[in-house]
Structures are given as structure tokens and as C-alpha cells.
Amino acid sequence: MTNDSEIVVEEKISGPISDWLSNKGFENIPLKEDHLGIEVIKISPNNLLSIVEALKNDGFNYLQCQGGYDEGPGLNIVCFYNLIEMNELKEDISPREVRLKVFLDRNGDLTVPSLYSLFRGADWQERETFDMYGVNFKGHPHPKRLLMPEDWKGWPLRKDYVQPDFYEMQDAY
């Protein structure tokens, strides 16, 4: 006979979007949803474009945000994509949302396909991620720095970035 306090119930991590992707044959790894209850899914860079295209065809027609972050020295560089279904919004119904994450080995190939062909709004967002973290977006029509000078060395938001000792100050006059 077991005590009720000893029963361990495994929490199901996968959500409806992860299940839908799996049923369509797309490899994905569901992660714990974020603090807002948004489903978070890990995908490989090779599957990014086809998965986002499938999600767009299923109604996720707005790329709310694309960005990156550094997990720390020696760890991954992560690209994330927040997709939303923007249709007729009703006050009592929240739109469907999903966050996709692509984990890249910082010492490996930091290339992912560009989403510019699906979402024109990815243009500057991908350029910023390139500029700050060094992620290359294959197929991007304007692959150049956005915030830093073209001759800047390194990726300033990486946690292993070594700051240069000298900055040339430009007079505004």
C-alpha cells in the first residue's frame, strides 16, 4: 500500500504545438513553458525554415520577435523566435503563441537559415543578432552589421567578449 505523498506524477512538458509538429513529422524537443505560459520548443537549425513555414501555414502569421542570447562562456549561443497567430483578436481570447529556440555550439557553425523570405520583419532583428552574437543567417539579403561599425572586431554581447582598450570618440560637432 502506498502513501499519497509518495506518488510521483510526471509533469507533461509537451504542449499542443509541439504535439502538432511531432504529428506532422517535425523533430522537436519540448521545453518547459515560460513564466507567461508560452510553449517553448527546441529545434535544430536544419529544421528551422520548414518548421516556421509549417507554423505560418497553420496560422502563426506574425514574427513578434527574433533575438539571441549567450548561455555563458563555453556554453551555447541561442537564437529564439516568438511567433503569434494574429487574426481577429477578441477580448476574451488570447492569440496562440509559441517560442522556438535553436541552440548553437559557440565553437561550431553559428549559421541558421534566415526567416526573411517568410517574414520581412526578420531583416533588422537577424542583423542585430548577427551584430551582437555572431550568428550568420543564411539567405539574408543584407548580411551586415546594424549597430556596430563595419570594421568592429568581435561580438559585444557574448559573455566571453573581451572589450577593446581604446575607443575613438567622435565629436558631434
From Swiss-Prot:
- Taxonomy, superkingdom: Bacteria
The record ties this protein, via Gene3D superfamilies, to:
NADH:ubiquinone oxidoreductase, 30kDa subunit
User: What reactions does this protein catalyze?
Assistant: a plastoquinone + NADH + (n+1) H(+)(in) = a plastoquinol + NAD(+) + n H(+)(out); a plastoquinone + NADPH + (n+1) H(+)(in) = a plastoquinol + NADP(+) + n H(+)(out)
Q: What is its EC number?
A: 7.1.1.-
Q: What is this protein called?
A: NAD(P)H-quinone oxidoreductase subunit J
What compartments host this protein?
A: Cellular thylakoid membrane
Chief localisation class: membrane
The record gives the membrane topology as:
Peripheral membrane protein
What's in the keyword line of the UniProt record?
Answer: Membrane, NAD, NADP, Plastoquinone, Quinone, Thylakoid, Translocase, Transport
Report the sequence similarity comment from the record.
Answer: Belongs to the complex I 30 kDa subunit family.
